[in-house]
Amino acid sequence: VVIDPGHGGKDPGAIGIGGLQEKNVILPISLEVTRILQQQGIDVRLTRDSDFFVTLQGRTDLANQIDADLFVSIHANSMGKARPDVNGIEVYYFGDRRLSDTIHRNIVRSVDMRDRGVRRARFYVLRTSKMPSTLVEVGFVTGAEDAAKLANANFQRQMAAAIAGGIIEYIQRNLR
């Protein structure tokens, strides 16, 4: 399984309330997802494990070169600072949507967030990965409710557990 923490290094991603940077929210969530999966005996690779920049192509090249079974890109959303009312999770797919549906269901079941659904999108990392892939938007750094949650380490662990639970469920149903 390749876990792809969005942005990093020179690319902070979205910047939200109080200067909250997407890259700094996403990395601890991604590291915790990785830890949980590894505890279950799952081979996990990260596209980045600290604060450095990786190109979009570099992210999917890694997954394609190692012939990964799954690619999970983790991001935080933004709507512009003029819209602090916009909050919630979204999960994206390009081809097969089963992985996205499974992760989405696990998040909605276990994390107190507005549900903005599962959507199809032509994001580069989804189009160019050769395995089932998903992009999870864990909340809005520009959303008043979400930003407070995303900055909280306990919430980050809760979100990571939900994402990892979805990945494990998908593997058990489709890859074993």
What are the residue ranges of the model-derived segments?
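Glycine-rich, flexible loop/turn motifs
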Residues: 11, 52, 87-89, 114, ...
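Conserved beta-strand segments of alpha/beta enzyme cores
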Residues: 43, 90, 114-117, 132
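Active-site-adjacent mobile loop/cap segments within catalytic or ligand-binding domains
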Residues: 66, 73-80, 117-176
